Every structure is written in structure tokens, then in C-alpha cells.
Amino acid sequence: MLIYNLFPLLAGPFGDWEPHFKRAADMGFDWIFVNPVQKPGYSGSLYSIVDYFQLNPLLVDPESKLTLEQQLKATLAQAGKLGLKVMVDLVINHCAFDSELTRQHPEWFVQENGNIAHPFCMEDGHKVVWGDLVQFNHPHTSDQEGLYRYCYKIVEYLLDLGFKGFRCDAAYQIPGRIWGRLIREIRQKYPDTLFTAETLGCTADQTKQTAQAGFRLRVQQFQVVGFPRLLVAGAISVSARNCSVH
């Protein structure tokens, strides 16, 4: 399994993706991984999604008479004709701070002192806050079923557009039982769907949790190869341990 990473904003509108698909196929890749294609929030970050059921307007082909969703479906169909399958980033650990979800379902999010909190990380002993993000509280929300059903609808929406799999962003931050149910129920309807888990920066126990949840691959890192703007995702089996990715 060889994965070619196509970054949407570098590739341009959906109608411009076919030459990249052809180049990837000619180099022997069989999967294309694209970063998030849904509508981003005020920061513009592709990983800060404001609306999961709208596509990024920057990817519209102004010369096309098709809707944006139709353009994407046609583009993914072109990949299939070249023998390629396309996976997309599934970002359900967090969303954009300016998403309507924060007002419609505040109980879905991690809160601090009665307010929805921004996620953060520690870097060199300093707290780095992602001010454009809010984190879903998958383990402890009072409406776990509602949040789960919403995530299921996101996956189904992306599959109906023509994607064949997912690179699940920050997968280790979502409980394995939730992933296990989601993967199982999606595969009941879409049996060939590929789920890969991002495990970069997580502990060994967290990696084990993703393996037990039903992920077929874990994506540990990206490696830049000797071509401008081409990124190859290093993916290894979840059953492998203490392996370096090349």
C-alpha cells in the first residue's frame, strides 16, 4: 500500500486534481490521501472545520457548471478510473471555535469554568493554545449518542461523495470504544472502507488502543520524497511495534 498525499490548497480546485492523480498512478501509488476538504472556520486552517457538510469554497472550479459536491464526485471518479482509491482526513476530535455546533450543542464540548475550552499542547514547557479550535468531549458528554450519530453522519457524507477511506486525525484522543462502534457500523453498510489512525506523538498504550478499535493501519509520520510538493505518508500495520517508517 503506497499513499500519495495531495494537499488540497496546493493542488487547487477539484478540476485540477486529475494530473496529480495521473502522476501518482505512474509512480506506483495506489492510494491518494487528501487533507480536509470541508469548509474551514475563520482561521482558514483545514483542520479547523466550521461546517462538516459543506465543502471548502476555495476548491471550487469557477469554470464548471457543476455544484461543488458534483465537482468533487467527478474528480474522485477520475481517480477510480486510474486504479486509485482516495482517503480523506476525518477530523472529529475537534472543530472550529466559530462552528454553530458550539451554540447548538455546547454539551458536546470540553468545558472549563462553565465555558467551552480551547485545546492546547505543551511545547518546551510552554502552553500553546489553539484558539481557533474547540474539542469534542467524546468520553464525558451528557449526549454521547447524539455526538456519535453526528460523527456517523459525517463519515457517511464523505463516503457518499466517493471517498474510500479515512486518515483519522488525532485518533488516539478519542476512546477506542467509540472508534470500534463507528468502524463496525460503517463497515456493515460500506464493507470495504479503510480506517487509518494517526498515532504521531501518542504513547504505546494509545497506539495499542487504536489497534484494538479496528483500525487497519496507523499513520505514524510523513516523509518528504525528492519531488517538489509531493508528500508520501508512511503507513504501517497496527500489528507492527517499534518499527521505523520509511
Can you describe what each PLM-predicted range is?
Residues 2-6, 32-34, 86-88, 166, ...:
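Hydrophobic faces of well-ordered beta-strands that scaffold small-molecule active sites
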Residues 40, 94, 166, 174, ...:
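Glycine-rich nucleotide phosphate-binding loop and flanking beta-alpha elements
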Residues 1-13, 18-19, 23, 27-29, ...:
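Substrate-binding/active-site clefts of carbohydrate-active enzymes
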Residues 76, 153-156, 169-246:
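Active-site-proximal helices and loops of the catalytic beta/alpha 8
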Residues 161-167:
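Conserved, well-ordered alpha-helix/loop/beta-strand core segments that scaffold catalytic motifs
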